[in-house]
Amino acid sequence: GTIRVSGNTSLEGQLQLTESAAAAVHTTAINGVTSVSLNFGIAQNFFTSVTAAHTLARPTNARVGQVGSILLMQDGGSGTLAYNACWNFIGGETPTFSTANDAMDRLDYIVVSISTDNTAENIQAVMTQAYS
């Protein structure tokens, strides 16, 4: 059967999916603003078309251990992406967003630490690029 839960729900103990069970997290669109502050309390996966110079700010409502993906589509070849200091990449090298028209990049992340107001302090991230 189907179990539907709405509202804030907490599960304690171990959750195990068996047999042919699958889990999926809803993808949320990001509005085309200059400084993008993702609300990790409403989604784990996000999508946006990058149309101008954007900065990925410190996410709000983050939880330690939270993981997800941010799908980034290059709108016209001129969009750029900068990052708040909480975003940390392998070797300290900030990736450059793809510039080809309609290029799709994916930024995968895990929240390592948060501040007392639940904004992210340290996010480890890796970008894979140029999906077709």
Predicted regions and their residues:
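Extracellular beta-sheet repeat scaffolds used for adhesion and glycan interaction
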Residues: N88-T94
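Beta-strand-rich interaction surfaces with strong enrichment in secreted/lumenal proteins
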Residues: A57-R58, T94-S98
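Exposed extracellular interaction/assembly regions and N-terminal maturation sites
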Residues: E12-N88, D102-D105, V112-S132
